[in-house]
Amino acid sequence: LIQILILMPYVDMSLNSQMIDMVDEYANAYFNDAPIIEVSGRTFPVEVRYLDSVEDRDRGVQQQVVQLVDEIAEEHYGPRGDILVFCPGERQIRDLAKALRGRDRIQVLPLYARLSNAEQNRVFNPSGRGLRVVLATNVAETSLTVPGIRYVIDPGDARISRYSHRSGLQRLPIESISQASANQRKGRCGRVAEGVCFRLYSEEDFLARPEFTDAEILRTHLASVILRMLELGLGDVRKFPFVDPPDAKMVRDGFRLLTELDAVDAHAKLTPIGRAMAKLPVDPKLGRILLDAASRDCLNEGLVIVSALSVQDPRERPPEKRAQSDQQHARFNDSRSDFMAWLNLWRYLEEQRQALTQNQLRKLCEREFLSYLRVREWREVHYQLVVSCRQMNFRVAPMKPDDEQYAAIHRALLTGLLGNVAQQDEGRRFNAARSRKAQVFPASSQYKKPPKWLMAAELVETSQVFARQCAAIEPEWLLETNPLLLKRHHYEPAWSARSGRVMAKERVSLFGLTVSDGQRVHYASIDQKTSREIMIRDGLVSNNFRQAPGFLKHNQTLVSEVMALESRVRRRDRSHPWRRGRRCRSGQRGRGGDRRSRRTRRPCG
């Protein structure tokens, strides 16, 4: 945008943000002190209370929250009002809900991204029955506004998505929030009346925190950004004037993934595959899957799976009905692959969509623990990808039976998920690519009976590294992937009389995982000099051939003829008078009875 304004100063641009401080900073630094217009909604004063007591800090967060809820219900801090409690994740929400349930006139309502629509509607449609306590992740910080909130309880932490270039994992660590996020949370109350924000940390802690949360470009994988910039011809990514420049290691890691996907060459230029990937409105890994699926005549199946991986899981698991929902979803499971479950679910929904009205389909989704809105989003993304593929002249053929297509589908998936392959170590623990350790996610169909080799849609680190969306694969499929990624080590070269060549054992590895070991290969194409020495020593000299080559047969025939000629000459020498062995006058056996010297011959004795 800055470059556009330099080239075209007549262009008007508006920069909008919920945080006026950040707009002020950017306006001063990049936009020549452009005017700032602040539009604020009607708010009431909010009192901030910090946890300054040492005794309070020693207690657990859950115990502090429960006590505060009880005190608010007893009107210790003013009139009763609904409470919004921020929690780092779903597990903390469940634990806190369990601790709060059973209290009179208190309605506990969870709120997080994977919650079913019915449960979310309870939060946004107050029933008027008792004091509402909304337990929410940071989704309620900016994305949603919960009505009627008068009190906010802020423990001061959140689960923040952060990519690690060292481990190659998208991590979800629980971190302390920034001052800006804390103020956003404070702003959730004071909308309908005066509010109170309880911060379960000290004021010194708050002032020591960073002013803003790291920009997303600093904590996410850059492959998609780099691919788009290369397509647009924006020059060297490493020299691009980002507002928040990413770490050079993150840029290198983005190029590494694009190289792995065969999207860029050794000179960091787009390959034909990379240019095709840039035309698809999905993550580069998913785009690579679609390109390979088209070449294997399983594009239709690939479109269903890729579109499913591009949206939030439509399968819902309400905490109080987990067993029932799991039973409903188990109908679509495949013992070999979680990816095939998407195909099974898609076929079922398409059949129902053809037979039912839209309202009936909505009710069916509700009964069978499926989010109707997410199912609809899945279909919309699928349609968008179908249009993109047809514009690229790809043929979208009808689906075939799963048994026929399993290998083709998963080989296509491998091209995009090559960095997420893993080899079984012990039980459910796996050695993943690049020296990582991972465990099969409990919700996977591969959890109870893990395969020897698997690939995962993602490796995510929470309490530990989990492989999510898994499928069994054959190690032989890995040998057909990008040859530049396979490392081959050869050992024990030896002469083979049976094949008439020098053979060696080969060990093939991918990202540190041994794919095959012990297969014998022709060594001459690997080390011609050593092979020649071994062939001469153990083959030619030792005459160790099962079937001698033509030149050797010719040489052996020639040697035999020379030896036969030599033998005949020796026999003639023995028949010569000088070789008859007559005795001389002195009784010694000599040559013709004469003593020979170099130049003369004289009688002995």
Residue ranges of predicted features:
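Sequence-structural signature of the catalytic-core scaffold of metal-dependent phosphohydrolases
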Residues: 511-515, 524, 528-529, 533, ...
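Short, intrinsically disordered, mixed-charge
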Residues: 32, 102, 483, 537-541
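Hydrophobic, Leu/Ile/Phe/Ala-enriched alpha-helical segments that form helix-helix packing faces
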Residues: 69-72, 100, 189, 385, ...
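P-loop NTPase motor module signature
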Residues: 1-289, 393, 397, 424
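Second RecA-like catalytic domain
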Residues: 79, 105, 110, 153, ...
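Extended, non-catalytic structural segments that build the interaction scaffolds
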Residues: 242-247, 512-524
